Amino acid sequence: MTENRAISAIERPLTTVDVVIFTVQEDGLQVLLVQRPSGPGEPFQGAWALPGGFVDVQLDDSLQACARRKLLDKTGVSSPYLEQLGSWGSRQRDPRGWSATHAYFALLPFEAVQLKPEDGKTAQWHPVNTLPPGPPLAFDHAEILQTALERLRSKVEYTSLPAFLLPEPFTLPQLQKMY
């Protein structure tokens, strides 16, 4: 038997976009992480997380537009490479309610990124092989980061993605080193 309910009676999940932002610094792959804020009702206070946030239905025409906005907010640049990674959702991923996130990954040359001064304490680059000590990444971000790493490593074998991590112009030896 099918229920016929008005759409206004259906609870809606929290909808977010998270962006895994990669760069290369000091000959190693790094990921940008943000520290979760403290305050009443904030989940995972003080834990590290991927940059992201809620979809703004007034500002964002699409999920990709939201991802581009979040990327620009945290890095001050628009990525020449932004790829949708996948979607994660469950009742358990956010203590505030049923939540779905749509994850993207971006590749940026380190020199192009200008972290905003007010984000200096809360947004930091971390080597992907040595994430910060303390509690695990907030929400299901460790799983999302792992998926992004696997996708990037796979695509390096048959695409020119590493070129997006280099400042322009770059030399052939720089590109070869990136691989």
State what each model feature region is:
Residues M1-N4:
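Short Pro/Gly-enriched beta-strand edge/turn motifs at strand-loop
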Residues I7-A49:
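N-terminal strand-loop-strand
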Residues I10, G89-S99:
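Acidic pyrophosphate-coordinating catalytic loop
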Residues L14, V77-S79, G97-T101, E118-G120:
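Short connector loops at helix/strand junctions that flank enzyme active sites
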Residues E26-D27, S90, L107-V113:
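Short, charged/polar surface micro-motifs in flexible loops or helix N-caps
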Residues F44-G52, A106, K121:
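Acyl/amide activation-and-transfer machinery of modular secondary-metabolite enzymes
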Residues G52-Q84, Y104, L175:
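The catalytic Nudix box helix
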Residues A103-A106, L115-L152, V156, L165-M178:
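NUDIX/MutT-family hydrolases
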